[in-house]
Amino acid sequence: NRPHHRPVAVELPHTPLAPQQPSHGAPAALATVLSAQGTPVTPDELVESVYLPELHGSLPEEMTATARRYRMLAYPLSGSLTSLLTEIAHGNPVLVMQNLGNDWFENWHFAVVIGYDLENKTLILRSGTTKRWDTTLAVFERTWARSDYWALLILPPGEIPASAGLLRYLQAAHDRETTGQADAALTAYRAASFRWPQETAAWLAYGNTLYAG
């Protein structure tokens, strides 16, 4: 990975806040990120894809699959606070999953991280119906840890996360290919071959997909 120089504080104020209906926090959070990345969509359009009535909520797998159906690259972050802050510093809001409950009561929640302040040790989220939710890093990490640090970056094909690792990125591109989006995968592989020009795996993936097409 390339070295990253993060500013002390960053906020992405133009990230929209999608309107949320009761129990539809996941569609709203996903709509927020998709819209921020140039794919305007409403939570109502996503409910059927991500909301599971029997669970009264959503699962990460549905969130990831739905992002791909909108022809976006769904890149799972490594689960470190460093990678999350790096993406925010580069202008990318990050979809996260938290458990706001406790040891005896689970309260799963999807939110979008849109800023941080390292001096004050705080994060800024689009959370539920709150456009600017401030929380401490300590509280966020505790609630985030309960989801095994699940975090998803959603980008247009061809854009590479600032914190990307080669194999993780190639896997995200391959997932596009296996869902019938070979053109989007090809765009991603091509970007990878330029980002990591010395890596044979990137060129092989690009060449094989180009040949198959």
PLM regions and their residue ranges:
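Noncatalytic regulatory segments and standalone regulatory/sensor domains
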Residues: 1, 118-205
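Cysteine-nucleophile protease catalytic domains, especially the papain-like/related folds used
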Residues: 2-80, 84, 90, 156-159, ...
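Short, charged low-complexity intrinsically disordered segments located at boundaries
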Residues: 58-64, 95-97, 115, 167-175
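Active-site-adjacent substructure of cysteine-protease-like catalytic cores
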Residues: 73-126
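Specific register positions within alpha-helical solenoid repeats of the TPR/Sel1-like families, i.e.
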Residues: 177, 211-212
